[in-house]
Amino acid sequence: MKTKYRIAVLPGDGIGPEVMREAYKILNILKNYFSLPIETREFNVGGAAIDQDGVALPKTTLLGCENSDAILFGSXXXXXXXXXXXXXXXXXXXLLPLRKHFNLFGNLRPAQLYSELIHLSPLRSDIINNGFNILCIRELTGGIYFGKPAGRLKKNNIEYAFDTEIYYNYEINRIAHLAFQLAKTRNYKVCSIDKSNVLNSSILWREIVQKVSKNYPDVHLSHLYIDNATMQIIKNPNQFDILLCSNLFGDIISDECAMITGSIGMLPSASLNEKKFGLYEPAGGSAPDIEGKNIANPIAQILSVSMLVRYSMNLKTIADKIDQSVISVLKKGYRTADISNNSHYLKTNEMGDVIASALISGE
C-alpha cells in the first residue's frame, strides 16, 4: 500500500457538487474506518470554472490533477454558464483535454442490472432473469473521432463531408491487453466487437486482438460484428461479461447497455491510462433540471469511488465492500426518486447516509 493516495476532486456543475458530497462520506470512511492514507484536494472545472476563471479547465486544476494519483469527477456542462454555446462547450473543453493530457485511452463503462431493480429495465423479465453485469471497454483516444483527414467541402456546387477511421496497431494492442487483464479479475470472457467483414480498420482490430489473446490462454475470446452485437445484447445480455470495442462502436454499445439497466443514475465509469491513472465519473450528465433539489441519485458517484479504489488504488477487497454496501441498501428497499416506483423515496443526502452506514457496519 502506498504511503499516501492523492485524489483530485472536481465536483463541476449541475448535480455534480450534490452527489460529490455523498462521495466524500465514503472517502471519509475509507480514511477513518479503513485507515487508508487518502488526501483529497478540490478544484474547479466546467461551467463553474468558466464563471470564476474564464476557462472550463483552469491551469490550477490541471496542475492539481497532475499532482494526484487519480481524478474523481462530478459532471460538467451546466446551464448556468454564461451562454448556451458556453454550456455546450463546458464538457468538451474540460473532459476532452483531461483525457488527452493524461492519455486516458481506456474507457470502462459497467452496466449492471441488480436483481432488486429488474422492474426498471425495458427488457422483458424472462430475458434478464436475475440481472446482468457487463463491462464495456471502449478505446477512447483513437478511431474516427480523431482520424485525419476530416472535414466538410464543396466542389462543383456539390457539398460533401468526410471522416477517417484510423487505428494504429499499438492503440489496439494496449486496449486489448487492458480488456484481457480485467477479464482475469472477472469471469474470464472477452467479446471483441468489430465490422471486419467491411472495414479495414476492423480487420486490423480483429487480427491484433486475436494475437494478444494468445498471452491469456485462460480467457475465452469471441468476436461479433457490431450489428449482431447490438441485437444480441437485447436478446440475451447475460451471455456477455466484457465487451471490447473501438471508439465509435464503444460509444454506441455502452449507451445501449446503460439503457437496458433502466437506471443511468446508478452507473459509474472510468478512463484509464497505461499506468492505471484514472478519471472516475458518473456515466450520466449534469442534470440541470434537478440541480439543487436534493433528489439526484448519488449511487453512480459513490460507485465511481469504488472504481477508483479498485483500479487506481488496486484495493479490490475494499472496492467490493463499497459495492456490497450499495447492494445492501437496495435489498432493504431504499430508493431515490429515479429508481422508485412510488412517491416514497430518499433524498440525495439520505441515500448517501444509508450507504455510508452500511459500509461502516459491513452489511
From Swiss-Prot:
Cofactor binding remark: Binds 1 Mg(2+) or Mn(2+) ion per subunit.
Pathway linked to the protein: Amino-acid biosynthesis; L-leucine biosynthesis; L-leucine from 3-methyl-2-oxobutanoate: step 3/4
Important for catalysis, annotated site positions: Y145, K195
Entry GO terms, CC: cytosol
Reactions this protein catalyses: (2R,3S)-3-isopropylmalate + NAD(+) = 4-methyl-2-oxopentanoate + CO2 + NADH
Chief location: cytoplasm
PROSITE patterns: IDH_IMDH
Enzyme Commission designation: 1.1.1.85
Matching InterPro entries: IsoCit/isopropylmalate_DH_CS (IPR019818), IsoPropMal-DH-like_dom (IPR024084), Isopropylmalate_DH (IPR004429)
Cofactor (UniProt): Mg(2+); Mn(2+)
Positions bound to NAD(+): 78-91, 285-297
Residues involved in substrate binding: R99, R109, R138, D227
Keywords: Amino-acid biosynthesis, Branched-chain amino acid biosynthesis, Cytoplasm, Leucine biosynthesis, Magnesium, Manganese, Metal-binding, NAD, Oxidoreductase, Plasmid
One Pfam family it belongs to: Iso_dh
Protein's GO biological process: L-leucine biosynthetic process
Assembly and interaction partners: Homodimer.
Protein name (record): 3-isopropylmalate dehydrogenase
Organism: Buchnera aphidicola subsp. Uroleucon solidaginis
Gene: leuB
